[in-house]
Amino acid sequence: MAMLLQVALPLLAAVSWGWELNENDDSLAKIIEGCEWTSRQNVISEILLDRYRKYAMYNFFLLDDVCAVHEWNKNLKEPEFSENNEAEDKSPTSAQNTQEHIPGNNFPPPAASNPPVNSSCAKSAKDFFICLSNQLGDPTLNAMLLDNLEVACDPRFSPVSAIQKRNSKYVSKQKFYSWGGKRNNPNVFYPWGGKRNTGRVHRQPKVVIRNPFHAWGGKRNQKDDNVF
């Protein structure tokens, strides 16, 4: 199965490259003809390799449980250390399992580092990802897969999270507008997003100072007939 994959996939990539080369004959032909023979081989290899990576990534994302690979990779980056794990690490059996496999050593290699059998490569997305990593060893392909997994499976990149960020239930009312002006009613909303129905209890009553002049300029007369 592995030999069939290694032979069939490059052939498919070469056939697709040939079809696209006929369609885009002018652009690719100018690039290839302007190079020397060794450089020409490198250009063709880069084009085939890029299309093979896209083909492998397309088939990988056809699987149903691709987000399980994202969770598995995230747990590998952020291991959880607990008292039970520390106790297991101190035990002689765990020390024996974590020992590196050296030729001539009596201890078998760890089971987690063993690549899955070819028959199990298509059982799950995790096994398929491990098969691609072990058989191809292409760090660029692995980075492409992990980056696209983060965009597809991480809730921070989902459109639902963008809608929630704009909801007043999740975001408190800002005191300033985006253009820099200050809002007139900064206390209309609670910090958790709810709207205030009444004013604050501790707010002092508004004191109105009477203007001694009318709007038209004349002086006001008080009840005791004192003229200002």
From Swiss-Prot:
Record's protein name: Leucokinins
Protein task: Stimulates both fluid secretion by the Malpighian tubules and hindgut contractions. Depolarize the transepithelial voltage of the Malpighian tubules in concentrations of less than 10(-9) M and increase the frequency of hindgut contractions at concentrations above 10(-8) M.
Entry's Gene Ontology cellular component terms: extracellular region
Signal peptide: 1-18
Subcellular location: Secreted
One GO term (biological process): neuropeptide signaling pathway
Organismal lineage: Eukaryota, Metazoa, Ecdysozoa, Arthropoda, Hexapoda
Keywords: Amidation, Cleavage on pair of basic residues, Neuropeptide, Secreted, Signal
Annotated source species: Aedes aegypti (Yellowfever mosquito)
Start and end residues of each stretch annotated as Disordered: 80-118
Glycine amide found at: 180, 193, 217
